[in-house]
Amino acid sequence: MRKPSITITTAKAIITPDYTLIKSHSKYQLPSRFQKLDADSPERSTVVKLFYRRFMRLKPFISNVKMVKDTYRDYVRYKFMKENYELKRYLVFNPDGLRSKIKVELLSNTKCCEKILPVTEMQRTLEFVLKSCSYLPETKAQKWDIARDNTYCRQILKNLLTMQYEKYRSILHRGIGHDELDVKFSHLKTTSSPLTKLNKTEKKKIPLFKVFSDFDTTLIYLNETLGTRL
């Protein structure tokens, strides 16, 4: 049975059965005066908190489904607190035979607080997520393609969160550890062991690793194109 098609409009949002879309953006935007900050910058901690709070403020607008909102919350926490994006990017752009073991080890041991803060990329990512949650009417003054751009952002974010949810499910139910997927990025590494030398459990992981590897590789290339850190 289809949901009743009800739309509620307020001064700040448009509410449909599927989404709550923002009309007023001011409280979610960040001043554009910041430059890239290194680990020793006194502003670093403040800027991180500013970004983190704004991403979290957007959670109610990501979806009306609790599971999707919870996945978004967990993903934002992971991006700010655990993800080693430089290692992930290096593994994507350097095939197995071209990787430096020393470089991989160095990147693996670098803590989040020791890295340069990519303020420009974070700002663009915030704008991307804000677009995915925003309402733009299609009028003569508002070009259709601009409104459509917001829809594309919403669809991309939805696919990203769906794949992230599948990762969480794999960690919980399929014997794949969190460190394998989100810390070591084992799915992005080509195993040097022949299939005959892999045990039964390891062989079962290969098809799933391929799916996650293809998605994360595409995501890295998308980030390179858009200048984001999705």
UniProtKB/Swiss-Prot annotation:
<dbReference type="InterPro" id="IPR016613">
    <property type="entry name" value="Irc19"/>
</dbReference>
<comment type="similarity">
    <text>Belongs to the IRC19 family.</text>
</comment>
<dbReference type="GO" id="GO:0030437">
    <property type="term" value="P:ascospore formation"/>
</dbReference>
<comment type="function">
    <text>Involved in sporulation and maintenance of the mitochondrial DNA. Is probably involved in a pathway contributing to genomic integrity.</text>
</comment>
<keyword id="KW-0749">Sporulation</keyword>
<protein>
    <recommendedName>
        <fullName>Increased recombination centers protein 19</fullName>
    </recommendedName>
</protein>
